[in-house]
Amino acid sequence: MLFRSKYTVRLIDDLGYKDVMSQTGSKTLFVANDEAYEKFFKNNPWGVHSYEQLTDAQKRVLFNGAQLNNAYVLEMMSNASGGRKNLSLRQESAAEAIDSVKFWRPEELPVNYNADEDEKKYWKRYNSGASKGIYMAIDASRPMITHFLEGNMREKNIKRSDVAFVLNDKDGWGESEATRAYVFDARVNQADVVCLNGYFHVLDKVLVPPANMAEVIRENNDTKVFSHILDRFSAPFYNDVLTKTYQARYSAAVDSVFEKRYFSINSRSGRLQTEPNEKLPNDRIPLLPYDPGWNAYQLSSSVPSVEDMAAMFVPDDAAMTDYFVSQGGRSLIERYAKKPNTKENLLENIDQIPLDIIQALVNNLMKNSFIETVPSKYYTIMNDARDQMFPPSQYPSEAAYKAVFTKTLMANNGVVYVMNRVISPADYAAVIAPALYNSNTQVVRTVVRADDSYIQGSDYSRAPLKQYFSTYLKAMQSRFSFFIPEDEGLNTYGYVDPASMANSKNTSNFRYFRFRPGDTRGVGGALAVDAWPVTYKPATGQQPGDKIMNGTTYASPANQELNKGMGAVKRSLLIEMVNHHIIVHGSDDTKGVETAQKYFLSRDGAPVIVKTSNRGVGMEVNGGFQEQLEGTPAAYTSTVKEVYDLTRETNKGYGNGKTYILDRPMQATTVTAYKAIKDHTQFKKFLDLCTGMSTALLEKAGFNAPFLVAGADDAKHSGWLKSAAKYEFFVRGESGGLQYNVANDDRLVRLFNNYRYTIYAPTDAAIDAELAKGLPTWDKISDYLDTNLQAEVKLAADKSNQDEYDRVNKHNDAVKAKAQAMVTVLVNFLRYHFQDESLFVDQVSHTGDYATACINEQTKAYLSLSVTQTPGQLSLKDKAGRTVTVDGTTHNILARDANFNKGMTLITSSSYSVIHQINSALLFDGEFAGGYAQAWSSPKKARAFVAKFRIKD
């Protein structure tokens, strides 16, 4: 297989491929004529001016890098394996990783000026000191060839103008022009020349396969700053295969050959988080989304490397200088730099920015799909907050978008778009930013970023928390108030473990945890936070002088897996704490917590109470636990020490709220709704009605009849027990197939379902008023049944007593029908006082309809209450049209129904509620304004009523 070009022939001869190219086989070559070579020698990236100046390595690049180890006609190159048409964008070349091995002089190697001793300087050994220089490949995977063929372009919606732009073709490529094909940036002039052992395709220039994106960025003259930053994520790794291959090929006395790799989520060996010469991963190393030096880059395990490549949006040096010296990145330099913020000090100053902070800038500019980021699809390119990276308001047309770029750089694993500006990540503009920047917020930073590198594909199952807090807090269309307890407060005052209080009446077992930044020491599934237990004394609360418990029984060091021992408790408490400190406001709410309103709901429904009129630095905020401690020696508040305004109104339209640094964390109440109601004696009769039901009474009333097997008397049928549970209100243990784990003397509201609620608790006087109108009690229903039910008659074998049998059954059916109506009235009466959503007596004005726990079976709709909030007052309108106003003194009682795991060591789910006293009860049916007996005035009416208001689970 020969092409009539002396340079191609010389390459074949010099590299020893004459016999290979002369034999039958399957090869594809991309070749250029002699004229193209003459032009190449006048201008090329290697600075060689004649064939004789080419090194053997360069010859291999020119020949092997333009060769495929299969025979392809041009049209078939876009087909993927298995006959899948038009899916291939790339092909694996015949080049080898060994071809890129060279001796790197010290001045060619990355330099890290960071002064923090904790940041490893992986290159220092080779760019200074005794061991200067290194033999290294820029990657150990086989280089690939990218081609632009119209079949693949049509399949992937890539326009000709996209390809022209990527190839820096100023003349363009119109849709009406002739078909073209490109291999990298070389145009195919003649395709499908047949040889005995394959095909060759003639190009319009000598094909010099580009390096990977990281190397292309490094070599480009005006992306040096970004390359410098990128290389902080890299390290040299010894490669035994490369070493032995290099020694054998060159007979060289080279002890070690390394490869340059980047710490990343997606690399040729999967997640690369293990440092050179180490065996265990270091989860404190910030990761790039993928290795930009990976020649054979693969988007995911389900997308073969031939079907796509990556893309990077890299600011040029001028843009990077402006950004850090005088624009958006200036604040980072001012916070971290050691030297004056000047162009001359730029690299040294940038290197002082912690790696996990600068990571956000780099990752935001790295996109995992070239196909989805071509210019014609610019409006679908998303930033780290999943917002448009190039919004139409700033880039109204494709032409305006393209004007951002000074050039494009073709690499063997992607395309680099060189920009004249820096696009800041949402990390720098969102409420999460202060958690990342502040040196005293490492615990919260660790928690909110714990899942960041587990977003892609199946990695979700490996995320330590599975909460993705940072993704949530970067929702730029939302508005947040984010409270961040600082490390000092978490280490001094800690966070109370509610399970320890629920699990024992012995206060000596009560504890709180002090949280500190820690080190996982490479343990997978751990979290870099230490949790040290301290005995909680209710009389004094959390005090700086409290001693950490002896032993490790209740401790959870940072290197403990979160699914083992107290690791699960630590995980649960930290998730709860962060959720409790996030408030989500309406999209048009520009003031957040800085209004006259006092009560706010956190992300998980826990109330946050603003205690002071001051709404900036010095503002005091409480959780329910702090409210329950008021007036005791253990009382405390959380005080705001710093405020960061990150609203879009003050940040050029891109922001999502305010961040408040707290001296210590808030915490939710440990009082259940049952305990809260029980502790207020004026609600005794309401509580008695809620707890007076018995399964025996329901069976006596005949509710279990549908579950009885014919010919049997099995009142304990499992289906019946599950059905009977829906009549309960406060439960403990098993109920209706669900488990409610709570302290022995406590109960949980069965109607609650991991949400937020309001309970309107009628006073005893209010209940008495309804009883006087005929509202039944459980005792009265039981007495009615005992008094009116007749002894059952067994039908004789000869049916001689048929009349008596029928009479008794008819009588008892009527009695049971009325009793069932009484039960249905009572249960719905009580349920109507349990409402979805937590509403407070507060300085707000709002009117709305809110669902209760009652349902109208005919309309299939939950019955609602019309609620009106005015400053200092909350009024209700029930289904009877009556207005009931919440008591002006006893209201806003906070409760949390926490359901613990079987071992009572951590909370598995919880519902928050606020309880208000009402001095008149609420009616779920307007017909009851004059009395309740009409619901069971006849068996027919009783059955109709039960059908309409049947109790649903």
Where are the predicted features?
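Mature, structured domains of secreted/extracytosolic soluble proteins
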Residues: 1-953
